[in-house]
Amino acid sequence: MEEKKFDPYQFIGFILIAVILTWMLYRNGPADEAAPAQVTTEQGSTTTSSPEVVQVSDSILQQQKVAAFGDLGSLFVPKQIENVRIATDNFNVEVQSKGGQIALFQLDEFENYEDAPIRLIDESNADFNITMTTLDGRIMNTREMYFSPYLTDTGDAYHLVMKASLSSGEYIAFEYHFPKKGYLHQVAIKTEGMQRLLNSGTPPQLDWKTTVFRNSISIDYENRYTEFTFGYEEDRVDYLSLSGEDQETREGIRWISYRQHFFSAILIPEAPISSATLTSVNLASDEALEEKFTKSFETVYPLTFTSGNLNTKLTFYYGPTDYKTLQNLEGDLETSIPMGWGIFGWINKFIFLPLFEFLSSFLSYGIAIIVMTLIVRLAMSPVTYKSYVSQIKMKVLRPDIEVINNKYKDDAVKRQQETMSLYSRAGANPMSGCIPALIQLPVFYALFSFFPVAFVLRDKSFLWADDLSSYDSILELGFNIPFYGDHVSLFPILASIAIFFYTQMTTGQQAMPQQPGMPNMKIIMYLMPLMMLFFFNNYASGLSLYYFVSNLLTILLMLVIKNVIIDDNKIHAKIEENKKKPKKSGGFSARLQKAMEEAEKQKKAGRK
């Protein structure tokens, strides 16, 4: 269950789908320590960088640090800087001696829009810090301490201990466990003998901060799906605002995800976090197309001393935001991916995702989208048939409706009563097209949610589209058009053309006379292709490909139904025969007519 907040982009998308629905309704109605070493294995290489000796007088530094931190001052004196680099099957990681934290985390098997390896941590864009208070009230941060590395190759993993020790034996350590396969790694935060120096009454504060790199050619599109999400017990998921700055304090958190659209950094604590301050800041703007970062995320929460020492274990996931990959891990991490809420999410998880995975296992990704579209349209063909029959009936009744509108143009209630009477005598129900339209709505919105987060489409090309997860630009404009962009994408143009012709077919087939006082729905429907063109120009080309093929197939289905399956003359004759039959009382029309009469009486009584 997700706890949703206002999302402007999903709101715009839902408005578009609502317009489509309106149109349809309208026309249908600790480890052993080893000395620093260089290790080479089949999985990769682990190296310790050459020491960088800090050319500062040790005695002067010692005096300065002791003055600042008392007995703990030696932890802040740089002797030499030793960074340890480890390569596994799935990532390269570098841990630096200053702060004992990760300075580089790189996914070599994936590339960004500049064909460079995906970096989740680099160039000081991340910080992992523990703030502690001494007995005499001094504040110290691990990011300022200097740690010595102790590396062990255990066969299936690398175990790295980064330790900052006092001469008397007390120490603070980060113990890293990097498996040689997969995207998980563990960190244990430990202290030993520090209870005589640290104030155990003031809980240490863990501060995890990341400034997210831009990885996609469209920073605006990527930023829509770059989000701070977090999970509770019982699969409940919540998130911070996508825009501006948002800071909240939450309790009982099971995991925290810094989702960078197609890549995520996820923190999984050993036990639910009692209380955490969560912050998200949007750094990108539509005009700043060359920005390096998209958002900044930060989490701060207290740790707990055990017998005066720290012994906290954390698990991190740094890898692709892929539904199947996350689903195979513990903790329901796949719920961090916005597959859609309610029935839309169920459709994606249990229908479209398995179907697309099956099709793409033996077809190219573009062809898989086309075949999936064909399957969806064939499944919806009974709905299309029902809609078309409703159109034919409304077309037959159009002249009679015009006569009623002209005859009772000054009496809305009487006009509506006569219209409903006509429907009843003709055996036509103006609401018969509503159910087919409502059935299709979950499919529309589910696919609208599915394609933008489908990791399998990333970097997959089809025809002129280099990446089905991004827009398919065929022309760079060199300037920015508001709400459109600085480029021209072809699939949205094709989809808009298909929607235009589909609109021509349906409105031409069954455009009912405009009711007085009502907006001209024909004009509104002709705006839909233009809206599609602008809205989808920066969207995933895979989604535009789906809508293009879907509308083409719908047009073909309607032509087949019209020219092969349905006999218009029989439908005409049936309606004319029904119109001649005696009027029946009761039913929906009678109840509606009675309700309208009562409303008119109350209205007149109110005027008196």
Short names for language-model regions:
Residues 8, 33, 59, 72, ...:
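Short linear motifs in intrinsically disordered/low-complexity regions
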Residues 28-114, 120, 162, 582, ...:
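Juxtamembrane extramembrane loops of integral membrane proteins
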Residues 78, 83-335:
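Soluble non-transmembrane domains of integral membrane proteins
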Residues 1-49, 95, 180, 189-193, ...:
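Helix-loop-helix
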